[in-house]
């Protein structure tokens, strides 16, 4: 029990752990003898179906289930999805709400909302593992599908006390003014697709300052004109993110770029200069880069001058000798990064560590590929694509 209580992140526990807990408390046949606090602690780690079954056992159990936050991994709200389980053969306006109870098991449900005249039609798909188990169809009279879908999603946020770990919002006009969301203090992964900076700001302000993963997108038709401004990029959630990808123009300055803490990131450059990228590489070479750095993808057609970017930096070109010595690595790298100039830059602090710089007409990629390894007391470099 102590081991479960001390988990830094809540999760759905394994069958073995539930069995151990059941033995510890004397099995569920002794459930009625447990005090309320102990019952609540057990409830926190039950899956959704088990909670539903328990809630119909008695009025007191129903009350406990209703006041105990449910564990939810991710909530997703998507605008105008296609291929909606044969709901229609044509595209139509809809909202899909997905609730995932586990990151990897596929245990989830999906609810599709769409408008038919004055009524909202709903299809509810439940999944256990990776198989669809059941489908329900409903009609809500005299209401709006957009409003009802958001209310439904936010109701599930409330059920888990807004403590889910991941959120994915892909909506053009999320009703922020009428929203009940105030804080997402435990959310560590956030994906937002929006057409304005105000929506990005509204969601980021509700998240912790240090995120594991952040992704910002806009409509595909806007990606070459929509720009995330420099002042917005000072958000702590951006500066401290472990991984982030912005699928639109992003006006990072060189200073902001050099102070990022992300191990993996990518964005469309607006203000980044060759000097800024040169300084970024030199920081890594001299041991001042981000610890355990993995990948930086910089999309720009203006920053393809390898001479300016690599000045003052020692490197090894991928010549014939290198390609023969590291044939497996080079082949794997070339599958992901096609035609373009590729060079290897070695750390001055540890020569067994290196990064690959890849230049293409519209991308500069900086990727940690060489890693120190020791086998049979012999130290060597192992090259691999992260």
UniProtKB/Swiss-Prot annotation:
InterPro entries: F-box-assoc_dom_typ2, F-box_dom, She-1-like. Disulfide bonds: none annotated. This is Uncharacterized F-box protein T20B12.4. PANTHER family: F-BOX ASSOCIATED DOMAIN-CONTAINING PROTEIN-RELATED (PTHR31006:SF0), F-BOX DOMAIN-CONTAINING PROTEIN-RELATED-RELATED (PTHR31006). Residues 29-76 form the F-box domain.
